[in-house]
Amino acid sequence: MSKNQTYKKRMVPIEKPTRELYSLLIDARLTFQRDVRHTLWQYTVQEVRNMIGHIGVADNYPQLRESALSQFLTEFYKVSADLKMYNEKGFLTQKVYLQAFPLMDSIERQSKAWLTNTINARVGSNENGATESVS
């Protein structure tokens, strides 16, 4: 009996959720979904490339471009982690969850591939340059 009583005490403190609580939860969910949609849909891979191209003056300063992409991916992982957390807590509808994650996965894969190709191209050109100058 005492275990049962202890269990009951640990249950959700609000026995009857008030209308205000429901209202707050709905507002929080709608606001979060709107923000997530805005954040995700404004960053297509092409927009990221354009943004980084402007920041890094692509051909002349490849290390700046790589830095900008790394910075973007860092922010991107924060958004991704937040999304997963909010989904686990039930703040995302299934529709938003199903729309958001494939898009985020695609951005992540394409951005990483682009970053890898950029670094490999730079390393390859440095090796060629070094070989030519030695011989």
What are these regions (language model features)?
Residues 1-135:
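Amphipathic alpha-helical assembly/interaction segments
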